[in-house]
Structure formats: structure tokens, C-alpha cells
Amino acid sequence: MISLKGEGLSLRDILKKIVIPSVCFPWGIAAFLMFILHFGGDFPDIYSYAQPRLGAAFAVMLIVSFGLFSVFSKDYLKRLLPWAVILPLLWAGTFTWAYGFASLPEKKHLGDYYVLGALLFSLPYVYTIGLMKCGGYVRAALQVMYGAFSFFMLLFPLIYISYYWRFGGEMDLFALMAVRATHWEEVKEFLSTMGSPLVLGLAIGVLLLLLLAAYVLTQQVGRCAESGEGLLRGSGKKIKVGLIVISILFFGGFIRQIIHVFPINLYRTMNSKGSEFQLLQNFNTNLDKNTAGLKLIDPADGLDEGTHIVIIGESANRDHLKAFTPSYPEGTTPWLSSKVNDPDFSLNYMAYSNFPNTLMSLSYAMTSANQYGDMDLSHAVSMVDAARAAGYRTDWISFQNRSSLSSAGVTLIAERSDASFWEKNYDEYAVDVMKKLPPAKRRVLFINIMGSHYTYLARVPADQRGALGISENDPYYGYDLTAAYTDRVIRDIFEYAKAHMNLKSLVYFSDHGENMEHFHSTSPFFYDMVHIPFFVYLSPDYQAAHPSLMPVLKSHEKRPFTNDLAFDTVTGLWRAKTNFYHAAYDLSSPDYAITMEDAKTFGGKRMVKDDPALAK
């Protein structure tokens, strides 16, 4: 057989055997996909398909189709078709569902997966030619490589679907950052709760099935190439040149495209220069550099003696805290509820986290960085550095695990303290550590508790659960137990510091909130993931020395506040104002400027005023 007209095919044959099938095949696929996507609701008319990446996908389909029909015989195209179509169908099907039916954002990326699907379809044909030309160890190596390739190409869509099934949203950059930052102890806790023998058995079974599927796919594709006869449309020079061209084109195109889709696109974004992850990795260097330029606005000559405490909660949702939501049926905050009308306490009922992710939220909350455009992480200083510059001794007690991101985030801030204590115990042991602290005339103490960190029941000693007053019929029993336990822990910290440490102020806020179904994530996002508690205690003598603070705090209790402004607020309270301080972001300042029109969350990408809870 001959390849082209110059070698024997008539124009009619070229038109019939190459051109028409090459055009009809991608048009048929495109029509089918448009028909399916129409039912998802996001592609209601023909104009909604006018997206550059969908156009690029169609162009790639045409190129792939023309290349395959030009080089390979009709019989071989049919013979390999059932096996060549498996991976493209899996990828195209998964992401057609994700972007067409699952209401995921960034629908412009759908075309990327159709490009990948077209190139995936071409690879078995290219691979079998290489297999046919090789023997011995080279052939065996090719088969192993194709088997491994098939396994991972089967696995990645399954991971995507599983994550969505478990959390109700796509696995995005911040989910991957959280996974990368997860400590082994957290993995063990998660597996002990979610990983029942049945679930673990199913997971192992699925992996074994995927290995088997990859093996079968590799073997079947290999069998199609066992006979060298009938693979190509001809044996002339043009066919051989065409084969080389499409092999380079399709394989090179696949390599280029795979880096733009899940999960490699997330990994590349996470590690790209200038990304939030890279900023966190450079956090320590930047803090050192920025702290060198730290200057006090007010000299600390008259700095009050005593202790200031900042308690950083975990996954606390104020909607579940009766002190903030009096209509909540469970008595989750008996101690704090008793302080609601206390003249020494101020509760903010409109507090929000800046981000539904610990890594990002605390990196902003504990530094001068904020989401209002004044400062980013690369130019920020930490609360610890501001306190030390003002002449305070700083201590940090943490019940969290040290992050595996050893050069980033809150762990680095903690280790900038004069002393840091990393405890592996229940939050109530904070008082035991406080008793061991060296004496200091002026101290800022940070306590980072586990609070309501999943898994919930693991946060509360079993012998105390019955005494916390939470009904076992409560649908959120485990979570509400952690809230009641945290209330008791804060009470004990407060009472001890007041009696033994000359307590001047205590500030409490959470890193982020929690959704009872989806926990906290960027996808899907719900506003209760950023609903957090925030309160301030000022001792009577501290109020007497600074009489404007509490009245201003009380007047701002119904003003929106986001925890990336905690730096300005606490340094204002401590009289530790620096050149990084902004009165407009200090909740205790009469110049506090954030209104409902200004308040932001989700790294500045969402407005607080759009919170559906505000419309109730």
C-alpha cells in the first residue's frame, strides 16, 4: 500500500480514506460533548462554547485525527480503538462532569482536558510502533513504562473524583498545600477516625484493581502490535517521515499538556516563583530582613508591667458558640456567656477569618500582612517581633504539630519567641506550662490550642465529655464538645493568669471557622468556614491606665473585623505600635475604618457583605 497520491492513492481515495474521516471524527466527538454539556446548564447556547481553550481542543482533535488517518491503516485504527479510547474517555468524562455538572469554577480549563484527551488517544498508536521496532530489554522497559503510565493516568482522575466525593469540591492549590503541610500525627489521627478496616480494605482493593487494569491495558495494547503487518497505511518514505513527525508531535504535545492539568498544574503553581507557597518558604528570610527596619512609633518608656495573652483557636465557628449566637441550642460557652455583659470584656459579633485555611490565615493573622492591599507576606513583620521590639518577653505554647513546612508559616513565627513550648497533650495542659514559665515583668504569651481541630472527639479527654453539658442527641455532638471544652480551657488560662501573672489583656480568636459537612476548604467554600469568635479582655487597672480602649472596643462590637487585622489590634492594645501599625485596622482605635463595604475574606477575593447569613 502507498501513502499519498504521489505514491499511488488517487485524490478520491485521499478524500475518502483520510480527509473526510479526519474531519468527521472530531466533529462527531465535539457534537456529542456539546450535547452532553448542554444538560449541565453552564453551556446553554452555541455562544457559550466560544472559548479559546475549547477551540484549541477542537484544533488538536483535528490534527490528531488527520495524523492517525494519514499514517495508520483503517484496520489497525479499528483494532486498537477499544484500548486506545479508555484513558481519554476517563479523563474527558471526569472533567466534563466536574466543569459541566459539578458547578466548579474556572470552566475555561475544560478545554485543557479535552486537549489532553485527544493526545492520550494518539499515544497507544505511537507507543505500539516503538514496541514493534524494539526487542529484548528495551521492549520490556517500554512495557513497564507504559504500564506505570497507565496506572497513574487511571489513578489521577480517581483521586480527583474521590476528593470531590469526600469534600464536595475540587482539590485545588490550597488543599495540596494543606496536604503537604500535614504532620504524620494528623495523618494517623485521620486514618484512625476515617480509615476503618472496611475503608482501608476498599482503598487497597481499588489500588489493586487499578494495577490490574493497567496491566491488562498494557498487555492488550502490546498484543495489537505483535504482528507488524497492517499497522501502517503503507511502507513508503513519506509514511515513515509522517510517522516520525506525528510521533514527535503527539508525544511532545502530551508532555507539554500534562503539566497544565491536574495534579501537575497544582504542583507547579505551588512551587512557582512568586506563589503564596514560595512566599511562605521565604518567610523566615523576609521576617529577618523586615524586622531590621522595625521602629516603635511610641517609645516604650512607660510600658505597663504585666502579661498580655493571645489565644489562637482552631476551627472555631462562632455560629456554634452560644456567647456569640444566643439562639444556639447547646450551651457551648458557659464561661464566656457569663462575661458577655462584663465591663472588662468585649466580644466582636462580626469577626471573620481572612482565609479558610490555617496555613494562610495565621500567616496573615500573626503578621502585619493583610488582604486590604497595604502589605503582603514578603514585606511583613510578626506580632512576636513587634512585642519584642517594645520590650516584652515573648513565650509561645503550642498544642499543634510543628508543620512539615519547616521554613514557613506559624511555626516560624512561634520560634521567633524568646521561648517556645511544643506540647503533645490536651489543651488544658496550657496552665501546667504557664506555671513553669520564668518570671518576667512584661510578657506577651501566645497559646495556640488544638481547639476544634478534626478529629473532634480526639480533642476532649474521654473522662470529661459527660461533664461538659452537651447533649448526646446533638447532631454536632463531637464538634460542640470541643467548643465547650475550649471554653473551659480559656477559663482556666484566664483564671490562672489573673491570679498569678498580673494579667493585663487577653485576646482570643480562631484561625478559621468550620462547616459541619465540608469542614474548611477553598473548594467548596461556604461563609461559615470563616465565621470566627473574637473577644478581648482588659483588666480594670489596665483600663484605668488606658481609658479609651474598652469604650472603643465596645462601640465596635457590631463592626466587621477580619483576623488579618489582629496584628494592628493587639499591638495597639499592648502600646507596641510600630511603623508597621495602621490605626485604620486597629479595632481598639477610634480611627478603625473597616465597614461592611470594605470587609474582605478569602484572601481579598470575597466580600463579607455577600455572606448569606447577613441576609437572615
Regions found by a protein language model. Name each.
Residues 2-265:
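Transmembrane and membrane-interface helices of multi-pass
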Residues 88-93, 324-331, 498, 502-503, ...:
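Histidine-centered active-site microenvironments of extracellular/periplasmic hydrolases
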Residues 136-142, 167, 183-186, 193-195, ...:
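Catalytic cores of PAPS-dependent sulfotransferases
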Residues 242-467, 562-563, 568-593:
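Active-site-proximal alpha/beta segments of enzymes that process anionic O-linked groups
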Residues 291, 295, 432-435, 467-506, ...:
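A long, amphipathic alpha-helix that forms part
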Residues 374-379, 472-484, 522-530, 543-570, ...:
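A short beta-strand-to-alpha-helix junction
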Residues 389, 439-440, 495, 550-551, ...:
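C-terminal luminal/periplasmic domains and tails of membrane-associated envelope-modifying transferases
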Residues 578-616:
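Phosphate/adenylate-binding glycine loop and adjacent helical scaffold
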